[in-house]
């Protein structure tokens, strides 16, 4: 069948990310012209009837790209069956379904991006665009110079090798609220990818705990101007810079 891959069509329509669209197909929730769709299938949205959960797939809505300062204790998922607070509830979605482009664990804070543009999110998260992450991390006990050198050189974690691109002493930006009772030392660190709890696992490997972890930058986008729980729309130039292409 000619046309586009089904998961790309679903992502472009704003129903899910590319990976989420693949899961919808695998779960049997997508039909094309009345029959169950298969992974890898192509379709033409101009001529084929595409249904997701029994609802006809409509035209793609206007793309939305938001930056939000996630507080600690909020999930970086669109929904939660246990009713826990989601970062999506912090923003005005204008009735559109949004999901996070990338994640932070529930105890971490800082910059996240919410969008309904699955194709853009897929590009933005791809390593080829070099959107490194920068964090302000409160570490206790403070790691030695030798420990930091080891983390910069790289160590083997259970899911493969990992390393810090850089680590330097320095406080978090002013947008990050601080406590008088905090213990440890603040570091500014850079990593090249966003693997699950990667920063925490790296410091655990040298005998230190991450007391607070605040993401302050993704690629060229920073936390500047966003206090905890605040959000804003990305400018078109910011959207383009993160994905190497113009948004739809």
Tell me the role of every PLM-derived stretch.
Residues 1-248:
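Basic, flexible Lys/Arg- and Gly-enriched helix-loop patches that mediate nucleic-acid binding at interfaces
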């Amino acid at each position: 069948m000619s046309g586009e891959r089904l998961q790309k069509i679903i992502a472009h329509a704003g129903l899910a990310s590319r990976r989420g669209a693949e899961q919808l197909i695998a779960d049997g929730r997508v039909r094309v012209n009345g029959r169950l769709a298969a992974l890898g299938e192509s379709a033409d949205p101009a001529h084929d009837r595409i249904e997701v959960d029994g609802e006809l797939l409509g035209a793609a809505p206007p793309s939305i790209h938001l930056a939000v300062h996630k507080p600690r204790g909020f999930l970086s998922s669109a929904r939660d069956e246990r009713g826990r607070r989601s970062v999506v509830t912090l923003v005005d979605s204008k009735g559109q379904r949004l999901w996070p482009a990338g994640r932070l664990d529930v105890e971490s804070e800082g910059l996240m991006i919410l969008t309904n543009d699955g194709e853009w999110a897929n590009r933005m998260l791809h390593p080829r665009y070099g959107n490194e992450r920068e964090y302000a991390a409160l570490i206790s006990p403070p790691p030695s110079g030798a420990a930091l050198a080891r983390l910069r050189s790289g160590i083997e974690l259970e899911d493969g090798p990992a390393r810090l691109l850089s680590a330097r002493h320095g406080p978090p930006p002013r947008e990050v609220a601080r406590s008088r009772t905090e213990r440890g030392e603040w570091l500014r660190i850079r990593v090249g990818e966003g693997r699950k709890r990667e920063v925490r696992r790296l410091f655990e490997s040298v005998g230190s705990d991450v007391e607070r972890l605040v993401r302050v930058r993704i690629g060229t986008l920073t936390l500047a101007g966003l206090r905890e729980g605040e959000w804003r729309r990305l400018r078109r130039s910011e959207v383009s810079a993160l994905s190497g292409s113009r948004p739809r």
